[in-house]
Amino acid sequence: MFDQIAGGRTDAVFEYLGSGNPVDSTDAAGVSLIRWCAYYGDVSAIKFLLANGESLDALGANFDLNGVSFHGHWQLCQFLIEQGADVNRPLPGTLETPLHAAFCKSDQPVFDLVADVLLAAGADPNSTTAPAVPTGSFMRDCRTKAETPLHRAAAYGGENAIRMLLDAGAAVDARDMNGDSPLSWASWHQRPAHILAMLCFGQHTIHPEAAQQSARERAAGWRGMEKSLAGTPTHGPAMSEPR
């Protein structure tokens, strides 16, 4: 049954514990039940494990909020923040924050929701990574560049996420270790004109008609059902009391 859980059937933790197995069980590689549930973003399964004696500390430092943000689980991000995870705690070495981790994959609207949750909880949109430190955020042979979350969002984020960062005070003219701005990153990654227009500053401009045409073409992209199935974060009293 553990193999089923590790394969994504995290609902099986209820039967697994009901059969008398320990709450801190691990697979052959030492990965625990709660870590598998976090990998798949199953808040209900995690709550069940906690009610049976497991601890969020088993997820690692800061309840692995960076990892959860990286995987796009906004619901679990919100739960972990309610339980005391620090949205501005950087990883040692790279100094990447959860907000940096939310912008490592391209063209996935669920990361807009992760950014929404993190920013609502006070994430700093101008935090910077360390310069030239190897990072696993892009899986292989990559180093940080003293970049802000907006730099990464310029390359990989959606229009909504970029707007949220700007509205939260992200510096559009921030420079990384190479002197590149978010507009530079967007240009390197050949982002569409309406994204480039959001990041222009100083002498840099995009023709309004090009931006409008780009936005019209983009409107035919993400489907309504895809957005609906991702859910909608709400910001009010915490749904879960800290344990």
Feature locations, PLM:
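Solenoidal tandem-repeat scaffolds enriched in leucines and small polar residues
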Residues: Q108, A115, A121-D124, P131, ...
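Ankyrin-repeat-protein effector appendages
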Residues: M1-D3, A121, A168, W188-R243
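Ankyrin repeat A-helix N-terminal signature
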Residues: D3-G8, W36-D42, G67-H73, A101-F111, ...
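Ankyrin-repeat boundary/"N-cap" motif
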Residues: M1, T26-L33, A58-G67, P90-C104, ...
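N-terminal segments that cap or nucleate solenoid repeat domains
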Residues: M1-W36
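Ankyrin repeat domain, specifically the short helix-to-loop turn at the C-terminus of the second helix
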Residues: F14-P22, K47-S55, Q78-D86, D116-P125, ...
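Ankyrin-repeat and related helical/solenoid repeat scaffolds used for protein-protein interactions
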Residues: E147-C200, T205-I206
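Conserved ankyrin/ankyrin-like repeat signature
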Residues: A12, S44-A45, Q75-L76, V110-V114, ...
